[in-house]
């Protein structure tokens, strides 16, 4: 299949290129950047030197549709909605990595403060919870924090066992994007941990949306992120206060059954490690029951650029074209 990437110069675009260049069913057709048109893709993604000879382009949507079977849209929030309508005006399939189509339109407009110009529905592409992504024409790829949080809590939410859910996530600085910020500036983040948006992070809406879909009575959900001096990875600690006491054995049975036949979710035992998932599309989950307080502590570890973004987008692409979801993604982590 012929693949295009709109907004290929950023971290998620670069990760799409890294993973797709060795995908056995993919031909990389184009990579776009308005500011870098004409320059080699490897001039910004030097790790891809010798693996592809693409140059950045800035074609119109009609040309993109004619040249590509599927397009990944990896542009900032509020920008994707300018591309998607024209890209879908034909047979080309689209996977959007921004937040523009993840939420119901009124919720998106309230949280992001942007008037939506194309309020169409898209399948939310967390494959483990939405197998209907298969054979779809348009998928909204989930956010990185919601991926880790929702995979951590989904089995207990689906069982109707959660009373209160509190999520604490630690993320590497690549989650801030390729443009330097105060948080990602080395003197500020080195040997430091920076909490931010303590009660009103916009990804909470995605967590709430997905967990209430599994349990319509669940409303008490809190989320606080922290940036840590690591390049990649998100470690989420979910404090799930349950309606009844559970043993660790009970939790093990629930999670094993829920994630049966879900190849990218692993239950390795013990505490998950960011190094065990770095560069891979896996989500590792561990847990321990606190029966005294009717609490289950669940930990999830993902690579924010892979399972939290580009790898998950390719997982969706595979299903959209009738391929095994592991195609081109069944790779071990780059540890240590």
From Swiss-Prot:
The entry's keywords: Amino-acid biosynthesis, Arginine biosynthesis, Cytoplasm, NADP, Oxidoreductase
Chief site of localization: cytoplasm
GO biological process annotation, one example: L-arginine biosynthetic process
PROSITE patterns: ARGC
InterPro entries named in the record: AGPR_AS, AGPR_type-1, NAD(P)-bd_dom_sf, NAGSA_dehydrogenase, Semialdehyde_DH_NAD-bd
Top-level taxonomic group: Archaea
Keyword Cell membrane: no
UniProt-annotated catalytic positions: 144
Pathway the protein contributes to: Amino-acid biosynthesis; L-arginine biosynthesis; N(2)-acetyl-L-ornithine from L-glutamate: step 3/4
EC number: 1.2.1.38
Subcellular location(s) per record: Cytoplasm
GO MF, one annotated term: N-acetyl-gamma-glutamyl-phosphate reductase activity
UniProt cross-references to SMART domains, sorted A to Z: Semialdhyde_dh
GO CC terms, sorted: cytoplasm
Gene3D superfamilies noted in UniProt: Dihydrodipicolinate Reductase, domain 2, NAD(P)-binding Rossmann-like Domain
Function of the molecule: Catalyzes the NADPH-dependent reduction of N-acetyl-5-glutamyl phosphate to yield N-acetyl-L-glutamate 5-semialdehyde.
Cross-referenced NCBIfam families: argC (TIGR01850)
Family indicated by similarity: Belongs to the NAGSA dehydrogenase family. Type 1 subfamily.
Protein's recorded name: N-acetyl-gamma-glutamyl-phosphate reductase
Organism of origin: Methanosarcina acetivorans (strain ATCC 35395 / DSM 2834 / JCM 12185 / C2A)
Protein encoded by which gene: argC
């Amino acid at each position: 299949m012929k693949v295009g990437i709109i907004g290929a110069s950023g971290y998620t675009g670069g990760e799409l290129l890294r993973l797709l260049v060795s995908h056995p069913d993919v031909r990389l057709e184009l990579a776009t950047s308005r500011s870098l048109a004409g320059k080699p893709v490897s001039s910004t993604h030097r790790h891809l030197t010798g693996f592809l000879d693409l140059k950045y382009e800035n074609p119109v949507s009609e040309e993109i549709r004619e040249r590509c079977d599927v397009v990944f849209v990896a542009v900032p929030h509020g920008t994707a909605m300018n591309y998607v309508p024209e890209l879908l005006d034909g047979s080309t399939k689209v996977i959007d990595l921004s937040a523009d189509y993840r939420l119901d339109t009124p919720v998106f407009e309230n949280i992001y403060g942007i008037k939506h110009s194309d309020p169409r529905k898209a399948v939310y592409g967390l494959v483990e919870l939405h197998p209907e992504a298969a054979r779809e024409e348009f998928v909204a790829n989930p956010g990185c924090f919601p991926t880790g949080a929702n995979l951590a809590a989904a089995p207990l939410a689906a069982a109707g066992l959660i009373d209160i859910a509190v999520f604490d996530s630690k993320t590497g600085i690549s989650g801030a994007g390729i443009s330097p910020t105060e948080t990602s500036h080395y003197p500020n983040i080195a040997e430091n941990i920076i909490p931010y948006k303590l009660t009103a992070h916009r990804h909470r809406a995605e967590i709430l949306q997905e967990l209430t879909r599994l349990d319509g009575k669940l409303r008490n959900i809190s989320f606080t992120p922290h940036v840590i001096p690591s390049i990649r990875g998100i470690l989420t600690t979910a404090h799930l206060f349950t309606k009844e006491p559970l043993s660790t054995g009970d939790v093990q049975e629930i999670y094993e059954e829920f994630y049966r036949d879900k190849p990218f979710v692993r239950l390795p035992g013990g505490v998950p490690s960011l190094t065990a998932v770095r560069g891979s599309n896996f989500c590792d989950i561990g847990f321990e029951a606190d029966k005294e307080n009717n609490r289950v502590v669940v930990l999830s570890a993902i690579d924010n650029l892979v399972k939290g973004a580009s790898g998950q987008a390719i997982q969706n692409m595979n299903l959209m074209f009738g391929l095994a979801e592991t195609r081109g993604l069944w790779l071990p982590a780059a540890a240590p």
